[in-house]
Amino acid sequence: MEKFQLTLLFKIIGIGSASGLVYHDEKLYLISDNSTFLYEYSIPTEKLNKIALVENAQDNIAKKDKPDFEAIALKGNDLVVLGSGSTQNRNKVVKYDMNSKKIQERNFEKMYEKIKSQLHISADELNIEGLIVTAETIYFFQRGNGTNGKNGIIYANDDAENQVFQFVPFDLPKIKNIPTTFTDAVLVNDTIYFLASAEDTTSTYLDGEVLGSIIGTIDLKTMKLTGSVQISATNKFEGLTLYKQSKNEIEFILCEDTDSELLESNIYKLVIRD
């Protein structure tokens, strides 16, 4: 993974603190951890469309009130948007059907309580930053930037009634002696590509100094780390989506969370060559 190229692809005006994205049919679907909109950006036309995920949606919500949408994943024709679970306000899951344009919203609190109870994760440690949904399994990427550093992958069969959750811990590489922790992930064939950032904080609520980001790979079958490389010393990359793939290289689109109220987002392209 040492051969990579990171470039600024474009800037989107109207989105701040981008926290996740999905590329589909020449469009980017983005979420912001300050907002209750889903943003649809057409790459060919450079047009931005805002989709309200809740009533009275807002672009910039106060930190104590925000639903903290940190994870977005594609499941069939649905985009699944998930709050981090790090406070009582952050337990919402929203599904957006890209065909019918219908929105379904529900409270995810019971599911998060089940995760905390089964896996002995305290309320101030839970911090879901990434999501992968397959036909059989749902994977949550727990960012272990709390006091106990519980960083890892939570997974279970995608059966809401009978879920038994498993936890696989991951000790990821450090940047300036601070561990990197998960910020997003995407599945490509049988390989999980993930982003992780180092932030000088022991709080799932308060932001700290950003020390950089890495990209890495995990074998889906063995759940073992297979590689990683630091891609930035300054950016906190929080969104990762597959863009293009060929025999010798793979391209991703990334977004970063600047932890500011400025309504503009830099979008990056990351190329990894064999």
Map each language-model feature to its residues.
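Sequence/structural signature of beta-propeller domains
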Residues: 1-274
